[in-house]
Structures are given as structure tokens and as C-alpha cells.
């Protein structure tokens, strides 16, 4: 480990991950990357969330990395939540989302006391975009705050442009009308419902929550982005200009996981034995397996999940299908059994009911494609593994990420989903892609057409670039150095 901070006054970064699996995983990776450079790291979270990362962090600490995990009690009672509801994926209904965000902001007072007592004094706060209360703490103690969105530069720039041109969204005649994003490096079209909700949200509690996030974004010192310059060069350049030079692409941060245990155990413990999974993959032909995972907060209705399953079956290709939140899909379990689906696909399909060792699976040579919900972590992990993607966006930034992968990078195939899944309206929305559509998209991705071969070549090229970016001398490795230098200069007494 090469320290990039002085021994007399080491930098001390305090990290605040948002309590959602897709936000916490990269923040823990960022903690390890910074600690490898000699930065003292304190991660602030709640007991239930700390337990998810205990093993990964213990291994990091035992290896000599200066990481400390501090826990604060989550005020679930004060917000009207149930005990244990400390993470987005633990909420049983959409109605609990607003109380959850209120509970998060109740953490300001206990966290402020923590910061007051910290020794050494924090040099910098790195906070998730969804925790605007940290801006007040940064201002009170005059500590620079770096923001982490968990999105790529393409989406961040898109959100910035649309906030500045709000009238474009206001003037649309319907939610299905297409518009072109102005002042963008590439010509990209969306409908109003496909853009991230932070960009366009009606009045009410949600607007108040997002307005607080936007204000915190605009008052932060800078932004770190889990991406790399070679992936989206024009967007990284333009977004850095928007942030007055204070935007650093430091990814893919997942590549800090170099040993099998860390790859297999990111966040929740896997619900399949690692050796069993690898043995199954070893039995398949090189590049033949489609990995299917629609994220930690998949809200597809039963009717759509059935069509997805039947389409995978009819594709006649080997697949791994991860279904998270399995306990919520009892009817699907019954259908698997009663319809004979599980019996019919047992030699060709592997069902993982819960969490999977995603990085291990994606990096296995038998895997040749990834059907993803286009959450940024999964999108980037697929790209890093050099795999072409079959895109199935659900909500939030996911339609943005689909546009980047399919239209800009030319490394993916669309499933055909045109509208987001609204929480509470899933059954009303129903089936967006039938089994024939699924089968056709799988064939387009995994087949032997010239276009499919070109996508695979392009995906491998991007994967190689991702690995080079984090090596010494690579763009992301260098950007971490630039970030640390910037904060060191701020920490000097005369500054």
C-alpha cells in the first residue's frame, strides 16, 4: 500500500452511504480504494446495514487498511416505521418510502455529535446524494463535502441539462411524446417518464425531498463518479465542466474486489453455494450462458415474470435467473412447480432464489451475455466483465443507462420496454414484453449475426479499457490521486 497522505497529517474521510443495497456496495468499494492510498476512513451507517458488510470490511481491516465502521441508531419509531426497516429493500410498501426518508434526515443530530468528537478531525465528507442533511454538517464544521450519486456521467449530465431546461418537460403534450435532450454530445430522445424522477417530479412530499437533494448537490464541493473516462469521454468532459472541474471519475470501483471471497460477498450473503454455482457454469460452453438479474428492487408483476421465464425457456439457451425478493413471489414459486417450468429447464437453467455472487458469475468464461435492469452498478459490472447487455430498465436512471449502452456504446440490445414500472401500479401496467419478445431479444444478443459479433467485440474492448483505467497510470487511478491532492491543499492551514 502506497500512502498518498503525509504521515504527520493523514487525511481522514468520513463516508455516508445511503441505506439501499445499490448505493452501499459501491460506497464500501470507494472506502477500500481510498484506504489503499493511506486515507483514514470512517464509514457511518446503522446497525442492520453495518451487518451486511461486516465480513468484507473485517477482511479489509485485517489486511491493514485504516477503516473504521461507526454505527448510529436508526430512528424508525420516530418516523412511523417498523423495527429492522433500515434499508430500502426492507420496506414492505411504497407508502413507507417517505417516512423512511424522514427517518434518514433525523440522523442529522446524532451524526453532528459524532463529527464533533472525531479525532483526527475529518478532512472531507463523502456523502450519498440521498442524504442532504450531511450538507448542513459540512457547512457547520467547514469541511468540504464530496457527493456520490451512484450514476454515470451520461445520466448526471442529462439530469443537469433537463433541470436547466425544465420547460421542455413542462411543454410535452403527453407522457409518450418524445423529446431530444438539448446541448448533448449525442442525439438522444426520451419520453418524460423515462428521465430520472429527480428531474421531473410533481408538487408534494416527494418534491420537497428531491428539492433538498438538488440543493445539496449544488452546494457540494465536488462529485466522485463510479465510471471511467474511456467509457463516456464526451460526457465525462462536459460534466466536469458543469462542476467547475470538481468531478472525478474513479471507477469501476468494483474492481477493488480481487479475491474470490470479496467478489462473492458484496452486500447480502449469496443464497447459493459459490462452488455449486461455479461447478454449474464450468459444465457449460464458453460464452453460452445468459445471466439474468433485474436488481435488488425488481417490481415486475407476476404476469411479466411468467413471460420472461417462458421466453428464456423457448430461447433454448442456458441461463442463470436470479430472482431477488423471492419471498414476495409465492405465486411464482407455485407456478414454477405446478406448470412444470422448473422441471423442464433443470438441465439448462439455474434459478437463484435470492442473492447471487454476481461478480463471480459475470467474470466466468461460460457467461456470454447479461439481461439487466440497467441499474448503474450492474451496467458497469457487465461492461467491466466485457459482456454485451440485454437491457430491461424499470425506473430511475435505468432508461438513461439503456440509451448509453445501446445507442452510444453500441454494446447492447433493447428488450423493448418503453415505460417505467410505477410502484403500486405494476399489475395495472402488466406485461410489457411477451415471451416471443424475450426469445427474440435473447437470440439477437446471443446469436451469431454480424451485429451480435460486433457487439461482443465492442463489449470486450470496453471491458479491457475498464481494467486499464484502474491500474497505476490509468485514468481512474490518476483521478483518485488528483482528488486527494485537492483535499490535501484545502486542508493546509493557510487554506
Swiss-Prot record:
Name assigned to this protein: UDP-glycosyltransferase 73C5
Gene3D superfamilies documented for this protein: Glycogen Phosphorylase B
EC number assigned by the record: 2.4.1.-
Name of the gene encoding the protein in the UniProt record: UGT73C5
Pfam families the record matches: UDPGT (PF00201)
Taxonomic lineage of the native organism: Eukaryota, Viridiplantae, Streptophyta, Embryophyta, Tracheophyta
GO cellular component, one term: membrane
PANTHER family: GLYCOSYLTRANSFERASE (PTHR48047), UDP-GLYCOSYLTRANSFERASE 73C5-RELATED (PTHR48047:SF153)
Coiled-coil spans in chain: none
Amino acid at each position: 500500500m502506497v500512502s498518498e497522505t503525509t504521515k504527520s497529517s493523514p487525511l481522514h474521510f468520513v463516508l455516508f452511504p445511503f441505506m439501499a443495497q445499490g448505493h452501499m456496495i459501491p460506497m464500501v468499494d470507494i472506502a477500500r480504494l481510498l484506504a489503499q492510498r493511506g486515507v483514514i476512513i470512517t464509514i457511518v451507517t446503522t446497525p442492520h446495514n453495518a451487518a451486511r458488510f461486516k465480513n468484507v470490511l473485517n477482511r479489509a481491516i485485517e489486511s491493514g487498511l485504516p477503516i473504521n465502521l461507526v454505527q448510529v441508531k436508526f430512528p424508525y419509531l420516530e418516523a412511523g416505521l417498523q423495527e429492522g426497516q433500515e434499508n430500502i429493500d426492507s420496506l414492505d410498501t411504497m407508502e413507507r418510502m417517505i417516512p423512511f426518508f424522514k427517518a434518514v434526515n433525523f440522523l442529522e443530530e446524532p451524526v453532528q455529535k459524532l463529527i464533533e468528537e472525531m479525532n483526527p478531525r475529518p478532512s472531507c465528507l463523502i456523502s450519498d446524494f440521498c442524504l442532504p442533511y450531511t450538507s448542513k454538517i459540512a457547512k457547520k464544521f467547514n469541511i468540504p463535502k464530496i457527493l456520490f450519486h451512484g450514476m454515470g456521467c451520461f445520466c448526471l449530465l442529462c439530469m443537469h441539462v433537463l433541470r436547466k431546461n425544465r420547460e421542455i418537460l413542462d411543454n410535452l403534450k403527453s407522457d409518450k411524446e418524445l423529446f431530444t435532450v438539448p446541448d448533448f454530445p449525442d442525439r438522444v430522445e426520451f419520453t418524460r417518464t423515462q428521465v430520472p424522477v429527480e428531474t421531473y417530479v410533481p408538487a408534494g412530499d416527494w418534491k420537497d425531498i428531491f428539492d433538498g437533494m438538488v440543493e445539496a448537490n449544488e452546494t457540494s464541493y465536488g462529485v466522485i463518479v463510479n465510471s471511467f473516462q474511456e467509457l463516456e469521454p464526451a460526457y465525462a468532459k462536459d460534466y466536469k465542466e458543469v462542476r467547475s472541474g470538481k468531478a472525478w471519475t474513479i471507477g469501476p470501483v468494483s474492481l477493488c474486489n480481487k479475491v474470490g471471497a470479496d467478489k462473492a460477498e458484496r452486500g447480502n450473503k449469496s443464497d447459493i453455494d459459490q462452488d455449486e454455482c461455479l461447478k454449474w457454469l464450468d459444465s457449460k460452453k464458453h460464452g453460452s450462458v445468459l445471466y439474468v438479474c433485474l436488481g435488488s428492487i425488481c417490481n415486475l408483476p407476476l404476469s411479466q415474470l411468467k413471460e420472461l421465464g417462458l421466453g428464456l425457456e423457448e430461447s433454448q439457451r442456458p441461463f442463470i435467473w436470479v430472482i431477488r425478493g423471492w419471498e414476495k413471489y409465492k405465486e411464482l414459486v407455485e407456478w414454477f412447480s405446478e406448470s412444470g417450468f422448473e422441471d423442464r429447464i433443470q438441465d439448462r437453467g439455474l434459478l437463484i432464489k435470492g442473492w447471487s455472487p454476481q461478480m463471480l458469475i459475470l467474470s466466468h468464461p461460460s457467461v456470454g451475455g447479461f439481461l439487466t435492469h440497467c441499474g448503474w452498478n450492474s451496467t458497469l459490472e457487465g461492461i467491466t466483465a466485457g459482456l454485451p447487455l440485454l437491457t430491461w430498465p424499470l425506473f430511475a436512471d435505468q432508461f438513461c443507462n439503456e440509451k448509453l449502452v445501446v445507442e452510444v456504446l453500441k454494446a447492447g440490445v433493447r428488450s423493448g420496454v418503453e415505460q417505467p414500472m410505477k410502484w403500486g401500479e405494476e399489475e395495472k401496467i402488466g406485461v410489457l414484453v411477451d415471451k416471443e419478445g424475450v426469445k427474440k431479444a435473447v437470440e439477437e444478443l446471443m446469436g451469431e449475426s454480424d451485429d451480435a459479433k460486433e457487439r461482443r467485440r465492442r463489449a470486450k474492448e470496453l471491458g479491457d479499457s475498464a481494467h486499464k483505467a484502474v491500474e497505476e497510470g490509468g485514468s481512474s487511478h490518476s483521478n483518485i490521486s488528483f482528488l486527494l491532492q485537492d483535499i490535501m491543499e484545502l486542508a493546509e492551514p493557510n487554506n
